[in-house]
Amino acid sequence: GLTKPLEETLLNANIKVVVFDGVVPNPTISCIETGLTIFKQQSLEAIIAFGGGSVMDCAKIIGARFVRPNLTVKKMKGLLKIRKKLPLFIAIPTTAGTGSEVTVAAVITDENSHKKFPINDFSLISHYAVLDPTVTLGLPKTVTAWTGLDALVHAVEAYIGKSTTKLTRQRSEEAVKLIAENLLL
């Protein structure tokens, strides 16, 4: 559905399109490895993540695994383990709230231990983020509510964080106000 206009535009520009629609909520290591296999087998040059936070996180680590083939997903856990530029990475979020399209972080689930772990590296920030609010209009109300609460948590975290500044606090207050007005809290 939502990706069709983008796919058609790319195909009309003679750009190869391969859709990986196997991302699961709370992306797993095996999901990433499947995406990586497709990326390599199809000789792709760029990643467009079109979806919510799980799609963004999965795409980031597919790119990271591509540029760091000898580093397993588990070995990427923590801070600054990738330190290599990803292939062109364009993020198009279909939810509002996770902020994953512009963060240094990805959260991955180890399906064997059922534990989540963060991967943080500056290379995980998308090269481009395309923010189109119209793609969020068809979301179920529950998804809008949950991602809105996610945005609220991010705003509060930014306000109370250890590296907060006057500008950060101002923006956090503005974000809380906008979220409250638009989610009818």
List where the protein language model places each region.
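ATP/NTP phosphate-donor binding region
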Residues: G1-A46
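A general structural-boundary detector
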Residues: G22, L79-I82, L139, K166
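Short, glycine- and charge-enriched coil/turn segments that flank and shape catalytic ligand pockets
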Residues: N12-K16, N70, L185
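Carboxylate- and glycine-rich phosphate/diphosphate-binding segment that chelates Mg2+/Mn2+
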Residues: A105-L185
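Short strand->helix junction
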Residues: V24-P25, G97, G138
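Glycine/threonine-rich beta-strand-loop-alpha-helix active-site module
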Residues: S30-L131
